Amino acid sequence: MAESIDIRELNERIERQSSFVINLMTGMDQVIVGQKHLVESLLIGLLSDGHVLLEGVPGLAKTLAIKTLASLIDAKYSRIQFTPDLLPADVIGTMIYSQKDERFVVNKGPVFANFVLADEINRAPAKVQSALLEAMQERQVTLGKETFALPEPFLVLATQNPIEQEGTYPLPEAQVDRFMLKVIIDYPKHEEEKLIIRQNINGEKMEVKPILKADDILEARKIVRQVYIDEKIERYIVDIVFATRFPEKYDLKELKDLIAFGGSPRASINLALAARTYAFIKRRGYVIPEDVRAVAHDVLRHRVGLTYEAEASNVSADEIVSKILNRVEVP
């Protein structure tokens, strides 16, 4: 009984403290038509301290959404256009010799920002991708003999085009795993596209002003950590990830020859973090199974390796995750 009272009090507190989420979403809706899933995914990454990889054809508002979110928060934003001739120094910076001072001085790269948009990340060679992904993991950059901490909050939002293969360098599985979410962006609905046309041909450009400071996001992350996850939900999360490794143990023998490798413990951690933040966005103080299911595809689709047999049969990671969610017992 005492626990239910605690949960009720926590729920009321989270509902009060998460009110800024509505303001952020309203600000995003002023500029972005539709794309609710994209907006929610960006907020999950922001409040979970996790990086986001967006995949979709050009023109689906990926860059605009990221730029709008950065504008709503009074924080430093930078955009890196990844190209085949890009160098690691173009991303993280370098040491430049100053003839005036007769010494090397630090020239910090665009990665030193709160929001970093890595546009078309799969167009740059592996060594450039590695430079960014190492900064994502370590939250610091070494230039010369000095190590510089990246600003807080630090969020990388990367985009890639799934169609064009020529002149691209696919991200290795180990590096893709550093992204908390991989979000597939779909086309807008019919009515949404009519509204997009109307806004653009009328020259309507909505300008958004900052409604939060960078420190507010750091405080919000502390509040998110208070969202309650029951042991049954934790077990459910682990069961889902284990089913990607040992499908036969969950009566999914048909998946055994389709999965080359399953999710690592990082998958379980990120699934729990994302579900908790999703509950917070929905202004709830506790996680329910539907929260886990809502974020499972975005957390797992880039962490489930497919065999040649799966690729030959046109079976996607999303289909495998869907089968697992349908089979694993819900608490």
Segments from the language model and where they lie:
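P-loop (Walker A) phosphate-binding loop of NTP-binding proteins
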Residues: 57, 91, 159
